[in-house]
């Protein structure tokens, strides 16, 4: 599978997505579509802090890629009228890296730490103290003679984002005063997002075309906007520039995004699960090897949607295909096929 095919319906941001995403991002909570419960709760947290004249509690947002966590972090800073500093867990390899960031924060600044679950453990321990006491302990010297020198830092608000909340240590998770879980979006919400994006991009998007794109966007705004741009390309080159239903269907068929929003990787996973493993159960690593992908790629890119859409069940014994998967792939299950009746297990566990 080519990188282009995989990236089209992947919730992860491609390099060329960032400039367009920046132009399409809502700037205020009122402009933000969807996540109504989170928006209402967040509005209360921010407004009450402003009325008290204090920094709001630290905020943790969890949910899949492409659901708006980074956008909300930017909106939080804008609503507070505060500067925003952006970094990520993988960039914090040592406690010194975190100390360098924290020591240069200005009072009231918002620090957005993406993929916070991937931060190095020594940095996590430093962050505990910084979040509670606005202090970092800088180690001077080495070995038994090393001394910790406390360094006061300016009060700040940490906004953490994670796609794997279960990987966060409890001491870190408990230090966030507000925890928000980002849900997948309804087709109706995605249609509103698509129409807004089309206006900003100067695209003539018909209602039925918007509904078709939304239905195949896996509940994820990032994917919806990406598909919108590919349908626009198709309409520009092979049509009259208008995004009609026929144009949307033809473009999405060309890019191998089917009626349920499945792409080539999704169908490869289902095909292997059904044909090679008779519907399962099968472990993640074995399933990933069978489609020539890394386990993390299958787990992060394909599996969340396949589980949510009802094609795969995660059971204590492994991944199991559902009757819906057999029907979608046009196959007949064997008489002894398992259908994932067992209780689902924690998404961060590996059978």
UniProtKB/Swiss-Prot annotation:
Pfam families: AAA_lid_4, RuvB_C, RuvB_N
The UniProt record lists the keyword Heme: no
Catalysed reaction, written as an equation: ATP + H2O = ADP + phosphate + H(+)
Ranges where the record places region Large ATPase domain (RuvB-L): 4-185
Protein residues bound to ATP: 24-25, 66, 69-71, 132-134, 175, 185, 222
Protein residues bound to Mg(2+): 70
SMART domains: AAA
Biological process per Gene Ontology, one example term: DNA recombination
Protein name according to UniProt: Holliday junction branch migration complex subunit RuvB
Organism: Thermobifida fusca (strain YX)
Gene name of this polypeptide: ruvB
């Amino acid at each position: 599978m080519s990188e282009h095919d995989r990236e089209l319906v992947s919730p992860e941001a491609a390099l060329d997505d960032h400039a367009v995403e920046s132009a399409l991002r809502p700037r205020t909570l009122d402009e933000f579509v969807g996540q109504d419960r989170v928006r209402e709760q967040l509005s209360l947290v921010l407004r009450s802090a402003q009325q008290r004249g204090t920094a709001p509690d630290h905020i943790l947002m969890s949910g899949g890629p492409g659901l708006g966590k980074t956008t909300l972090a930017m909106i939080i800073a804008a609503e507070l009228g505060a500067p925003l500093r952006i970094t990520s867990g993988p960039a914090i390899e040592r406690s010194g890296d975190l100390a360098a960031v924290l020591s240069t924060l200005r009072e009231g600044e918002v620090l957005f730490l993406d993929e916070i679950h991937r931060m190095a453990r020594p940095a996590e321990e430093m962050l505990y103290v910084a979040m509670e006491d606005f202090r970092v302990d800088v180690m001077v010297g080495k070995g038994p003679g090393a001394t910790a020198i406390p360094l006061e830092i300016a009060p700040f608000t940490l906004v953490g984002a994670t796609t794997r909340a279960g990987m966060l240590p409890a001491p870190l998770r408990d230090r966030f005063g507000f925890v928000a879980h980002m849900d997948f979006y309804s087709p109706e919400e995605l249609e509103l997002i698509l129409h807004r994006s089309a206006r900003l991009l100067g695209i003539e998007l018909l209602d039925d075309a918007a509904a078709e794109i939304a239905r195949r966007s896996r509940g994820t705004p990032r994917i919806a906007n990406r598909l919108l741009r590919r349908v626009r390309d198709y309409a520009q080159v092979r049509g009259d520039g208008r995004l009609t239903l026929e144009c949307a269907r033809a473009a999405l068929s060309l890019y191998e995004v089917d009626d349920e929003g499945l792409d080539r990787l999704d169908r490869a996973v289902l095909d292997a699960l059904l044909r090679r493993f008779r519907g399962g159960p099968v472990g993640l690593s074995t399933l990933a090897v069978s489609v020539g992908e890394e386990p993390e790629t299958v787990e992060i890119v394909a599996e969340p949607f396949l589980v949510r859409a009802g094609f795969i069940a995660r059971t204590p014994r492994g991944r199991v295909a559902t009757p819906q998967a057999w029907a979608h792939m046009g196959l007949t299950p064997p008489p002894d096929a398992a259908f994932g009746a067992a209780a689902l297990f924690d998404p961060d566990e590996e059978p």
